[in-house]
Amino acid sequence: MAKRTKAEALKTRQELIETAIAQFAQHGVSKTTLNDIADAANVTRGAIYWHFENKTQLFNEMWLQQPSLRELIQEHLTAGLEHDPFQQLREKLIVGLQYIAKIPRQQALLKILYHKCEFNDEMLAEGVIREKMGFNPQTLREVLQACQQQGCVANNLDLDVVMIIIDGAFSGIVQNWLMNMAGYDLYKQAPALVDNVLRMFMPDENITKLIHQTNELSVM
């Protein structure tokens, strides 16, 4: 019986986290109370306090348990691209955007991060969350270095600048799309968006190759 009770408690805890994600994304973190979350989850205020001391603890737990976007898209990537760092990078960027476009929970989390939260010192640091939902700087640098070695990224480019541009371009694409999701089909446009960003860093002779790459990547 105790085992079942523990399982039920864990199930309730996760339901509260999922409800909090929906409430935070809709109303904003500062405007959402634990009582709002309890009501939406159809539990008592006492029940939510049994699991979380306060809203900040719930907020932090929500992000701490969240896998990175890099982990979430891994199963949707093509095997065998390890020796082609440029195509590997291209695919990850496309599939990442398409995953966001298809998965409402991911959209809700990103809305919270970009549009619905004012961070304070007690919250998990914004930079930690942004890295979880975006690029790992060291990994991105290593991939870009490999691309330069293979001639896919121009050798005269400063990779620090390239990384800033890539991070700004894709976080900007996602932020703007989340404000007007009906404005365009992010899933369909993902290959073109990625190719136009990457084209800025390619030697001229490689651009023609990119134009002929298939745009038929899909996460589903």
UniProtKB/Swiss-Prot annotation:
Q: Which keywords does this chain's UniProt record carry?
A: DNA-binding, Repressor, Transcription, Transcription regulation
User: What GO terms are given for molecular function?
Assistant: DNA binding; DNA-binding transcription factor activity
Q: Which GO terms describe its cellular component?
A: protein-DNA complex
Q: Which InterPro entries match?
A: DNA-bd_HTH_TetR-type_CS (IPR023772), Homeodomain-like_sf (IPR009057), HTH-type_Tx_Regulator (IPR050624), HTH_TetR (IPR001647), Tet_transcr_reg_TetR-rel_C_sf (IPR036271), Tscrpt_reg_MAATS_C (IPR013572)
Q: Does the keyword Repressor apply?
A: yes
One GO biological-process annotation of the entry reads: response to xenobiotic stimulus
* Disulfide bond residue pairs: none
Describe the location of the HTH tetR-type domain by residue ranges: 10-70
The record ties this protein, via Pfam families, to: TetR_C_2, TetR_N
The record's DNA-binding region positions are 33-52
Kindly indicate whether the keyword Repressor belongs to this entry: yes
Instruction: Identify the PANTHER family for this entry.
Output: ACREF/ENVCD OPERON REPRESSOR-RELATED, ACREF_ENVCD OPERON REPRESSOR-RELATED
Q: What's its job?
A: Potential regulator protein for the acrEF/envCD genes.
Please state what the protein is called: Probable acrEF/envCD operon repressor
Gene name, Swiss-Prot/TrEMBL: envR
